[in-house]
Amino acid sequence: LNDLLMNLKGMAPLGIPVNKIGGQARNLPRLIDEAFHSDNHMLVFPAGLCSRKIDGKIQDLPWGKAFISKSRQTGRDIIPIHFEGENSKRFYNIASLQKLLGLKFNFAMLLLPDEMYRSTGRKYKVTFGKPVSIASLDKSKSDFEWAQQIRNSVYEL
């Protein structure tokens, strides 16, 4: 969870703090390693940011390979999940304006707590895909290529 969401009541115990504004805490690699080695279920957002409106459609930015690499290191299988929902037009407009102006700071992130509270009471569709055995992700593709393949399968759910 980003540093803003971690400060909301009840959110801190649910996530690993990822600092999107300043430097990362020294213990972040250890916290991630502990999470991957635990028996707890966890959600990973491979794009690192909320989805954006691209060509008129809400979609993720390119996914990173870290979730594949860590799953491979720890023997954790992957369950693809598609969460159908969207933030406000205001959120996407600010994200687009930020990109258009070439601003590095993620201004849209500042809206996430408000976006979360505005969605209270809404119903969302969550679809779970078939588990992907980490053993099935052989060396025929790089971890990055496997990440993109799983991303594509999530969008087909």
What are these regions (language model features)?
Residues 26-157:
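Non-catalytic C-terminal accessory region of glycerolipid acyltransferases
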Residues 1-23:
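Catalytic core of membrane glycerolipid acyltransferases/transacylases, capturing the structured
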